[in-house]
């Protein structure tokens, strides 16, 4: 039985795992490792520690799909819509700049439900808090080691973490990356920002006419979401959840600051925009070091093959463009090259 490892439990990784299970009919062990404590990557959904049913999307807020991708990725959208994983965005967003023909979608159960759906389809054995540090070539297999010192061997490895984290890996992989590939990986750049989820008491109302609001000139906050309102899941059993995301300059300026200090600043700034908000019952602050791809690999190949036999390939939106469709395109590119060589 072939052993396959996918590194990264975001959209690209989970979709690669699901497509592998679908496309490869031979017996297959499929493992998926992520260094974080939860699945989702940049589509993570946080839960209130007081009520797990009260959730907030700390990463992706909604999906925008152009007419081109509505057609190109039609099967993926139809499947997710049919299962209720995605639904059309119907609540008002103040300051949103859309293009004619664009469709917008939200995930009623939070965007991590998309990842959970694909992981369930894949049947992968998911291991969290598995931070890959080394990849060695041994006996025509990949020996993958973590920061705890544990190591396992695989016949095929797919890396879907951000490009800077690929370049940090040690072992034989260092010499397998060509100079051109190294320069391409170094050319990928990301924006950084913070997100803060705030959970409020049951019965509290936030009296604004919008579900989300973009702020064009605020020095700290660029986006506010009344998250349960955005997803159209307002309930008498859950209090409202609010997500605020910072501007990129603020994120860069405070990248090394403590999350507690950043959270305090963000709440102070929120009070100037929405005065009168009561104290939340719980808060969750998240630093996005790699928030969105601002510059991807040139020509956007969708993947980067580092070794053929055994197969080692990189995927992710750093090889396409930074959004939902970029991740789908990358997963499809990875599968295309895999089917060609295995």
UniProtKB/Swiss-Prot annotation:
Its EC number is 1.6.3.5. It is found in: Secreted. Coiled coil: none annotated. Residues 1-17 form the signal peptide. It comes from the Eukaryota. GO terms for cellular component: extracellular region. One of its GO terms (molecular function) is oxidoreductase activity. SUPFAM superfamilies: FAD/NAD(P)-binding domain. Keywords: FAD, Flavoprotein, NAD, NADP, Oxidoreductase, Secreted, Signal. Expressed predominantly in kidney and testis with lower levels in liver, heart and embryo and weak expression in brain and skeletal muscle. Its main location: secreted. It is an enzyme of class 1 (oxidoreductase). FAD binds at residues 12, 42, 61-62. One of its GO terms (biological process) is cardiac left ventricle morphogenesis. The keyword Secreted applies. It holds the Pfam family Amino_oxidase. The keyword Flavoprotein applies. Its cofactor is FAD. It catalyses: 1,2-dihydro-beta-NAD + O2 + H(+) = H2O2 + NAD(+); 1,2-dihydro-beta-NADP + O2 + H(+) = H2O2 + NADP(+); 1,6-dihydro-beta-NADP + O2 + H(+) = H2O2 + NADP(+); 1,6-dihydro-beta-NAD + O2 + H(+) = H2O2 + NAD(+). Catalyzes the oxidation of the less abundant 1,2-dihydro-beta-NAD(P) and 1,6-dihydro-beta-NAD(P) to form beta-NAD(P)(+). The enzyme hormone is secreted by the kidney, and circulates in blood and modulates cardiac function and systemic blood pressure. Lowers blood pressure in vivo by decreasing cardiac contractility and heart rate and preventing a compensatory increase in peripheral vascular tone, suggesting a causal link to the increased plasma catecholamine and heightened cardiovascular risk. This is Renalase.
